[in-house]
């Protein structure tokens, strides 16, 4: 059967369950734009910047691992998308990007047979995007023969969705897009080419060994990571958690695996986690880490002191993660999280309750109650602004179950991941690895559309929103029920804190009005110009009233919360100056603001480092 190649691409996406596409149209992708835009089974959301397309697709996939395609044009269309794609690469998010390219006979690849040495470019707006994206994708290819399109599409889809997921990219010259192909002549892809790189199935001896180690441990901890969702193991994880009955610790990408009120949840560990979560890890004698790569943000920069009393069982689909030098892993398990947890659940169901688990659980719950992230002083009024910790805690505590939230970077992600109340079934999208400013608005768009256009909270910052401000219009155009809460801390607050800490003798630079070299607009005028109903708050009391009012209404809405520019991130890993003036990086049980040594000593089941 003869079909236009661009239509073949659109039909392929539909046949693989794709229903949504994010795109900015362009001449180099004209036939792709036509095919995708007129396919009755696809809804194309047109953004105002290609970075927003990529971020929206990345956040969309986080909801239930369904892929939304991205379609961009040649040259700047492709390069503009890179930040969103590298975010998906580092956080292991399945993404499918299709780009247009100049006519094949005007590409530098084609010209190479004549020039011998490569041209930088030959065609108008030509750029060989595959060379740039090969380090941030599982598969990237330019179609140099139309007959290769089936093979490329099938291989790309398979690699994006198997093993450790990630982005894939197919670049298609414009003359091939509009040309016709004979589908019966197309060569297919055999997954066996690449499946040899996948881990073997977990054997039952490994599972039984893990069960025995948990039985014999006095202070076991379940360190749950986002790989659990990526593998489709969320439901079985919940069953395993109940059966093991041991404390659960999460971190940024995985905060929504378990609700705050669960008697198993004890906290979020890491250099910007909370005290209870870190105390659980640092006091543990056994850690079962599933689907978490245990990044430096989780171990802290003094990683040799991380979980120093624990035997670590780490389950990961990427063999390299099990061997990196910043962690110690006594029992590496190279496996798919769903395969591992499914088999673990069957064995755990047979396991008799472990008597010491209740006492250890009670201890972690006591920490959670007595050492909350949001302190009483943060609820007090300062006369001019709201407190960002109080705001995040209050707003999130008012959300219903199964709510959707997209979180940008800076104050939004630090405070959001520390203080956000996760309700049962709630989802929170944030990108922790690349952590780019400008993430919040397009991520909220992807989260909302991926969540079947349910009401969505967008946590943005005054610095971050400027990176993708144009997406305010995308929300309006598509009538998306997104409620934007803008944290206004008068500039780049994370960098302000760094400059306060390290460069006190110098004046501030590049952070906002106080450095006299960077300024921001009046967001009330911006919001109203785009057509948003606007709210604001400048105190904790006003914040509570405004939040209650905003949450009762339908979006899109814009609510600006003016927050204290002196509020530091706390608790957090921080350099400590000893009495002799020496600077040291304390282990993660010792977060700033530092507790008295006697108090910390009572909390720890193991000796403090200065006692060893």
Predicted regions and their residues:
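N-terminal alpha/beta PP-like core and its mobile active-site loop of ThDP/TPP-dependent enzymes
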Residues: 1-355, 398, 481-484, 504-505, ...
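Thiamine diphosphate
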Residues: 108-124, 271, 325, 332-334, ...
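Conserved short loop/turn motifs at secondary-structure junctions
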Residues: 225-230, 380-381, 461
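Phosphate/pyrophosphate-binding active-site segments
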Residues: 1, 144-147, 212, 310-409, ...
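N-terminal cationic-hydrophobic initiation segments that often serve targeting/anchoring roles
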Residues: 61, 160, 241, 396, ...
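A structural micro-motif
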Residues: 42-43, 93, 246, 310, ...
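Active-site diphosphate/adenylate-binding microenvironment
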Residues: 6-9, 14-19, 27, 32-39, ...
